[in-house]
Amino acid sequence: ERLAEVGPRVIREEMPEQDRAFVASRPFLVMATTDPVGQPYVGMLTGSPGFVSAPDGRHLQIAGRPAPDDPLDALLLPGARFGLLGIEAHTRRRNRANGRVLARSADGLSLAVAQSFGNCPKYIQPRHALFDPDWRAGAPAEERAGLSEAERTWIRAADTFFIATAHPSDDADPAHGVDVSHRGGPPGFITVDGDTLGIDDFAGNNYFNTLGNLLLNPRAGLLFPDFTRGSLLHMNATAEILPGPPRRLLLRVTGVRHHPAALPLRWEAAAD
């Protein structure tokens, strides 16, 4: 009931000018889509500020594409649903949008925005994103069914990850889209038991995009960035929501993709 009352005021059908300017100033976007069976995938697109532009409130142009070996690249076809997140960690600002891919070319993507909304600044760890002038792409991504012990250690030490979810319906209702959101907390806020991750669901905006999607479609895509090395850890997972209190999210990993030195960005801690 609360969401039905608040939603129309905060979830917009187009991006206001301040959000368009914000997204255009970002050196990276977190972006998600789904495969043909509804499995969400999430990754990062990077570029110099201005590589994303918004000619109006309902359209975005991205001058760039995911890396050719990133599953996102093969899935972001015209008509595909997308969710995206623009985030400025040192100010804790973030904005989300979803919609459909209009067109793609060798140079980039054209997107139609169906929904746009701001997001709670809680639990964002303050960092500055900087381009590494000496960056060279790392080894090809390694794929496997489960986590290595080194990856379990990485996850236990993480203070940030991103989760992509999707409504199971592919109809024209803008609420039936793909969503990608930020999850953060102090190192150790994620528990790891074999290939199962556990996260307490902290209070935020109470939009319930993530949990609402997972109740209808338990598939999730996860992304853990290594802010020091620019590596990415992608995971497919199946979710279970434990009502609590506290409400808790269990994510059973079904696939792993570890891409060393995938990004030209490095992050430095910023003053809190």
Briefly describe each language-model feature range.
Residues 1-272:
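Binding-site signature for planar aromatic cofactors or substrates
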